């Protein structure tokens, strides 16, 4: 019986790029809490002893950006110079400009050529769902995130006190070529920053027994499963001291782990007038509802936009041969049941709220948090009825 391998990865909240994402989204949330109509593109760079805040912000909100950045870094766990990055001691520089009026006139209702609220930029966005996990996410990315959440949990509650904030996980999964179903887990890679006091064998055993095995389905772990734990043998220096971190550098971790294409636009630090974020969320909402409705077991949707124009320039759907109805019919149903204009997306998913900080680590999709409206399956019944199933 033929098989194939597929791999996805996740990173912890202490990974330098994720530190940057979380600072950017914390600043976005602080602004939206006061000014829901603000225009925000908040970028962050973190390096040894340094946090740089830059981008374009147009708002009436009064926010202490430096305080928000320090509080976010501290919450992640970088609160001591021993860790190489200290929330209280690092320098924080603020370099925000305002949004270009040329862009603003294309987004503001009643301005520009299209008087509706237009897209904040051109671009293409994808959404995906499949039936491999309870939250309709691909297996490898779903469980990579769960491993990283488990590492954070054991670090923060003191059960493994020698853990430090930076970590990465990677899963290689074996699929049956005929059924497309997960057969077993081939390789688990988990690298975690740690105190210098802990020995390698103690660390390796604790990671396997207390992080990996409680998270991964035991029936998919076999005698052949390979465990690669801190494969270099040492990971003391990490976080922003080990690598420079930037907002928007973990876009595959943020989405589907490579199981679906990506349009290239990052999410964190962007208000929902930016279709890079809001339309990608809407695409996930569409794909998840199609799979939840039983119209397909796999669904990928692409939408595209032109700057300043409200209506999508294209909508396409691929169900990879699993659809119960044609893809043309699915597109018709999507147009009837989902408003994919920028303003429609914001209203449909209630996006003008300070809900984004939680999304900045452990994935934007496949987490049934109350704030994550794009994970609801409230359109599934109507889609199924309209499809005549």
From Swiss-Prot:
Where does the source fall among the domains of life?
A: Bacteria
Q: Which reaction does it catalyse?
A: L-methionine + ATP + H2O = S-adenosyl-L-methionine + phosphate + diphosphate
Please tell me where Mg(2+) binds in this chain.
Answer: 17
**BP-aspect Gene Ontology terms:** one-carbon metabolic process; S-adenosylmethionine biosynthetic process
Cite the EC number.
2.5.1.6
Binding residues for K(+), per the UniProt record?
Answer: 43
Co-factor remark:
Binds 2 divalent ions per subunit. Binds 1 potassium ion per subunit.
- What SUPFAM superfamilies does UniProt report for this protein, alphabetically? S-adenosylmethionine synthetase
Binding annotation for L-methionine: 56, 99, 243, 274
Q: GO MF terms on file?
A: ATP binding; magnesium ion binding; methionine adenosyltransferase activity
Q: Which UniProt keywords apply?
A: ATP-binding, Cytoplasm, Magnesium, Metal-binding, Nucleotide-binding, One-carbon metabolism, Potassium, Transferase
Q: Record's Gene Ontology CC terms?
A: cytoplasm
What is the annotated localization of this protein? Cytoplasm
Q: Which residues bind ATP?
A: 15, 166-168, 234-235, 243, 249-250, 266, 270
Q: Which HAMAP family match?
A: S_AdoMet_synth1
Q: Subunit arrangement?
A: Homotetramer; dimer of dimers.
Q: Hey, which family's this protein in? A: Belongs to the AdoMet synthase family.
Q: What is this protein called?
A: S-adenosylmethionine synthase
Q: Which organism is it from?
A: Neisseria meningitidis serogroup A / serotype 4A (strain DSM 15465 / Z2491)
Its taxonomic path starts at:
Bacteria, Pseudomonadati, Pseudomonadota, Betaproteobacteria, Neisseriales
């Amino acid at each position: 019986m033929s098989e194939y391998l597929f791999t996805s990865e996740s990173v912890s909240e202490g990974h330098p790029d994720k530190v940057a994402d979380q600072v950017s989204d914390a600043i976005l949330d602080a602004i939206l809490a006061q000014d829901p109509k603000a225009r925000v593109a908040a970028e962050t760079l973190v390096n040894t002893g340094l946090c740089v805040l830059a981008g374009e912000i147009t708002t009436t909100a009064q926010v202490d950006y430096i305080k928000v950045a320090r509080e976010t870094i501290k919450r992640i766990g970088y609160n001591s110079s021993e860790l190489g990055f200290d929330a209280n001691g690092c320098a924080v520089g603020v370099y925000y400009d305002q949004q270009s009026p040329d862009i603003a006139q294309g987004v503001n209702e009643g301005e520009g050529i299209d008087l509706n609220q237009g897209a904040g930029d051109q671009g293409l966005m994808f959404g995906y769902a499949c039936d491999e996990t309870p939250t309709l996410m691909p297996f490898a990315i779903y469980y990579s995130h769960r491993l990283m959440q488990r590492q954070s949990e054991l670090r923060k509650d003191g059960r493994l006190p020698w853990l430090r904030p930076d970590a990465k996980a990677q899963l290689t999964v074996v699929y049956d070529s005929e059924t497309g179903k997960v057969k077993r887990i081939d390789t688990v890679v988990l690298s975690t920053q740690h105190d210098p006091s802990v020995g390698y064998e103690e660390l390796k055993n604790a990671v396997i027994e207390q992080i990996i095995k409680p998270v991964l389905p035991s029936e998919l772990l076999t005698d052949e499963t390979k465990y690669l734990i801190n494969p270099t043998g040492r990971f003391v220096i990490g976080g922003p001291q080990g690598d420079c971190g930037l907002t928007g550098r973990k876009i595959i971790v943020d989405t589907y782990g490579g199981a679906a294409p990506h349009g290239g636009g990052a999410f964190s630090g962007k208000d929902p007038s930016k279709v890079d974020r809001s339309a990608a969320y809407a695409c996930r909402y569409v794909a998840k509802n199609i799979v939840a409705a039983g119209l397909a077991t796999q669904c990928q949707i692409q939408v595209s936009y032109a700057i300043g124009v409200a209506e999508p320039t294209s909508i396409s759907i691929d169900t990879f041969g699993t659809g119960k109805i044609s893809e043309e019919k699915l597109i018709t149903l999507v147009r009837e049941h989902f408003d994919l204009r920028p303003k429609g997306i914001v209203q449909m998913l209630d996006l003008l709220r300070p809900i984004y900080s939680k999304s900045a680590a452990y994935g934007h999709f496949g987490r049934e948090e109350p704030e994550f409206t794009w994970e609801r399956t409230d359109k599934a019944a109507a889609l199924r009825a309209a499809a005549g199933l």
